[in-house]
A protein has these predicted regions:
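Lipolytic serine-hydrolase domain surface
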Residues: 26-60, 72, 99-104, 110-217
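Short, contiguous clusters of charged residues that form electrostatic/catalytic patches at enzyme active sites
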Residues: 57-64, 87
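Gly/Ala-rich beta-loop-alpha elbow adjacent to hydrolase catalytic centers
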Residues: 80-90
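Gly/Ser-rich "nucleophile elbow"/oxyanion-hole loop immediately N-terminal to the catalytic nucleophile
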Residues: 65-76
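Flexible, membrane-associating and regulatory peripheral segments of lipid-active enzymes
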Residues: 1-23
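A general structural motif
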Residues: 19, 74-76, 102
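Active-site signature of alpha/beta-hydrolase-fold catalytic machinery across serine-
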Residues: 91-95
Length: 217
């Protein structure tokens, strides 16, 4: 987009047979007035009207970037996106199916249950059960052979506890609570800083996916 925000990443992988595969990483809403990833685009992307979805600035930007990158019609593409980025990914898989071979869509915290993603595309959706955004479509994700939904649960942050002095004189510090807007704002997660992030934050979705992987899901 030429901006410090609203930026996507396109990576090309050359396979052993000389053909290419591609990975497109799409950001979420940044709310900037001149960004293609503004608030209004979310409404357009979730429309039941295909033409309206295709006209969303964020979807058009990603489609144009893919064209300029030289992605061929028959070259496999994986799309990964958080929040609005996931809705864009679902829109591209649904509405650009004739232009590209979208093999895999990965969404994190994205309301995409109503998108008509074709059966040829594998979908992995990561959702956190206490946060609102992924539920804005008002529907559960399809239960099909090509659609996997990973649902994470964020435990509340620990309450304050006193320090413990042991018989040998050593001391175990107690937990110091970090307060936020909800009990989940301060729940510890790998990569967090001050613990004030909402559970829509991408780190929660990454942690949920990693936990599911560790459990053998």
């Amino acid at each position: 987009s030429g901006l410090e925000y609203g930026t996507i990443a396109i990576q090309r992988y050359e396979r052993s047979d000389g053909t290419n595969s591609w990975l497109v990483t799409i950001p979420g809403t940044d709310g900037q007035p001149d960004s293609p990833f503004g608030w209004a685009q979310n409404v357009e992307l979730m429309s039941a009207d295909q033409e309206r979805r295709r006209k969303a600035d964020s979807a058009r930007m990603v489609a144009e970037a893919m064209r300029q990158a030289g992605i061929g019609k028959d070259e496999p593409v994986a799309l990964i996106g958080h929040s609005q980025g996931g809705i864009v990914a679902a829109t591209l898989a649904s509405d650009w199916a004739e232009e590209y071979t979208i093999e895999h869509v990965v969404t994190a915290g994205s309301p995409v249950a109503n998108h008509p993603i074709p059966q040829r595309t594998w979908v992995t959706s990561v959702e956190i059960d206490d946060e609102l955004v992924a539920a804005l479509d008002g529907a559960a994700n399809p239960v099909t052979d090509n659609w996997l939904t990973v649902q994470g649960h964020v435990s509340p942050a620990p309450a304050a506890t006193p320090s413990t002095v042991h018989s040998d004189g050593s001391c175990t510090p107690g937990a110091t609570p970090i307060t936020g807007l909800t009990p989940y704002d301060a729940a510890p997660v790998a990569g967090s800083t001050n613990g004030r992030e909402l559970s829509h934050w991408i780190k929660y979705h990454q942690a949920a996916y990693q936990n599911a992987t560790d459990l053998g899901s």
